[in-house]
C-alpha cells in the first residue's frame, strides 16, 4: 500500500515537472524577434574563439591546476623560503614548461605568463617589526620561479610576477597548511615594460 502511494506521488511529481517544462518552452517560442540593432549588438558580444582573450582563457583552463611545488611530491615551499630545488623543478618543468611555451607562442606579445606567489596564513600579511610579512615571501617565491623558468627558455619579458600573500589559500585546506606556500600561473595582458 505504501509503495503504491509513493509510486503515485512520484508519477505526480514527474507529470508536474513536464508541465512546467512545456510552459517554459511556450514562453520562449512567443518571445519577439530581436531588431536588427539588437542582433548586431549580440553578435558583437559573442566571443571570437580566435581572439587573444579567448585563447588565453582556454590556456588558463589548462593552467588552473598548475602550481609549483606540485603539492604531491613536495607539499610547498619551506617556511619563509623561496627554495626552488633544481631536480624537483626540472621534473616539474618537463610536464609544465611545454604548455607555457605553447601558450606564449599562441598569444601576442601583449600577453605574459603571470606568476603569483602565495603563502600560508602564518605570520603578518605586511611587514611588522622584524617580520617581513607574507606579501614579501609570496613575491620572493614568484620571482624565484620566474628565474627558474628563464633558465628553461621562457623569455623574461613575457613573465610578470606578483605576490598574493595568504589571501588565496588552496580550496579545502586549512589556511595555515604548508601546501598554501606555492606559486600559480595564468596568462594575462601585461603592463607595458619600462
Predicted regions and their residues:
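N-terminal targeting leaders that direct proteins to extracytoplasmic destinations
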Residues: 1-71, 83, 90-94, 98
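Short coil-to-beta-strand
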Residues: 61-75, 108-117
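Envelope-exposed proteins and targeting segments
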Residues: 71-75, 80, 109-111, 155-157, ...
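Periplasmic peptidoglycan-binding/anchoring modules of Gram-negative envelope and division proteins
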Residues: 81-123, 146, 150, 185, ...
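Periplasmic OmpA-like peptidoglycan-binding domain that tethers envelope proteins to the cell wall
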Residues: 119-194
Amino acid at each position: 500500500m505504501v509503495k503504491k502511494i509513493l509510486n503515485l506521488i512520484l508519477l505526480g511529481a514527474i507529470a508536474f515537472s513536464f508541465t512546467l517544462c512545456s510552459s517554459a518552452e511556450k514562453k520562449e517560442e512567443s518571445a519577439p524577434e530581436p531588431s536588427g540593432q539588437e542582433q548586431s549588438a549580440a553578435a558583437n558580444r559573442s566571443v571570437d574563439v580566435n581572439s587573444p582573450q579567448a585563447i588565453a582563457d582556454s590556456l588558463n583552463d589548462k593552467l588552473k591546476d598548475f602550481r609549483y611545488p606540485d603539492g604531491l611530491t613536495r607539499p610547498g615551499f619551506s617556511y619563509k623560503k623561496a627554495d626552488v630545488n633544481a631536480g624537483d623543478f626540472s621534473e616539474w618543468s618537463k610536464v609544465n614548461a611545454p604548455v607555457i611555451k605553447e601558450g606564449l607562442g599562441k598569444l601576442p606579445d601583449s600577453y605574459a605568463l603571470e606568476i603569483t606567489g602565495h603563502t600560508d596564513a602564518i605570520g603578518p600579511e605586511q611587514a611588522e617589526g622584524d617580520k617581513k610579512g607574507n606579501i614579501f615571501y609570496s613575491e620572493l617565491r614568484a620571482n624565484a620561479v620566474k628565474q627558474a623558468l628563464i633558465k628553461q627558455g621562457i623569455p623574461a619579458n613575457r613573465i610578470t610576477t606578483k605576490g598574493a600573500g595568504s589571501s588565496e589559500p588552496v580550496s579545502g585546506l586549512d589556511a595555515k597548511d604548508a601546501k598554501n606556500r606555492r606559486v600559480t600561473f595564468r596568462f594575462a595582458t601585461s603592463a607595458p615594460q619600462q
